[in-house]
Curated annotation (Swiss-Prot):
Gene this protein is translated from: aroD
Name of the featured protein: 3-dehydroquinate dehydratase
Origin organism lineage: Bacteria, Bacillati, Chloroflexota, Dehalococcoidia, Dehalococcoidales
Alphabetical keyword list: Amino-acid biosynthesis, Aromatic amino acid biosynthesis, Lyase, Schiff base
Any one GO BP annotation for this protein: amino acid biosynthetic process
Enzyme Commission numbers on file: 4.2.1.10
The protein's role, per its UniProt record: Involved in the third step of the chorismate pathway, which leads to the biosynthesis of aromatic amino acids. Catalyzes the cis-dehydration of 3-dehydroquinate (DHQ) and introduces the first double bond of the aromatic ring to yield 3-dehydroshikimate.
Subunit note: Homodimer.
The species this protein was found in: Dehalococcoides mccartyi (strain ATCC BAA-2266 / KCTC 15142 / 195)
Claim: Nucleus is one of the keywords in the record: no
Family in the record: Belongs to the type-I 3-dehydroquinase family.
């Protein structure tokens, strides 16, 4: 049965047995900031494409080096085979950074709000501002404080159909948007490899996500 593309997040060196259970993933995300020096070893274990992400502490990650070091690490990941690089919208000199990195890999520009979910109008304005920076995919992640926040993010995807936008909310109240965003038009959604690889609040495991899609017969709704 066809499932929506799911990006499987890896935050620590995986066990071979865990990877065997991840056949439902479309590709992986390697969190370079959390994997540390073991990211190369993790990349060598993968049998599917991977995206590379290196989050600063201000963006919910653990990288504490300079911006040049961080961008350099992403370049190393691209050289090691990363097909896409996640670049935060808050990155200093974003235009120059994207121009530099897009010669080496596809790029995803991301924005994370760890406090709440802005109004629908503010979300649309945010995305329009992000679109000023050429990228392959745009990602807007907020924090749900109400079940209605899921609706805002799902509508955001549908309102800009000519661009590839991933949008959902973190937190237990945002789980619904994590599951449904592909139905609204997101190119993919995220899940953790297992419970020990969770990288954000409300993130489900790959096995849980796949089971839900199978239970609701996802293929017949696309």
């Amino acid at each position: 049965m066809k499932n929506p593309p799911v990006c499987c997040v890896i935050t620590r060196l995986p066990e071979a047995e865990s990877l065997k259970k991840s056949e439902g993933a479309a590709f992986y995300e390697l969190r370079l900031d959390l994997l540390g020096e073991s990211w190369r070893e993790a990349a060598a274990m993968l049998d599917k494409p991977f995206m590379a992400t290196c989050r600063r502490s201000a963006e919910g990650g653990s990288f504490s080096g300079s911006e040049e070091e961080r961008i350099g690490l992403l370049e190393k990941a691209a050289a090691a085979g990363a097909f896409m690089l996640d670049i935060e919208y808050s990155t200093p000199h974003l235009g120059e950074v994207l121009k530099r990195l897009r010669t080496q890999s596809k790029c995803l520009v991301s924005h994370h709000n760890f406090a709440d979910t802005p109004s629908a109008g503010d979300l649309k304005t945010l995305v329009k501002d992000m679109l000023n920076y050429p990228a392959d995919i745009y990602k807007v992640i907020t924090t749900a404080t109400s079940i209605n926040d899921n609706i805002k993010l799902l509508n955001l995807i549908k309102e800009i159909p000519d661009k590839k936008i991933v949008a959902f909310a973190m937190g237990n109240l945002g789980i619904l948007s994590r599951i449904l965003c592909p139905l609204a038009g997101s190119p993919f959604t995220y899940a953790s490899l297992n419970d020990s690889n969770q990288s954000a609040s409300g993130q489900m495991t790959l096995a849980q996500m796949i089971e839900i899609y199978r239970s609701v017969n996802y293929e017949n709704h696309t």
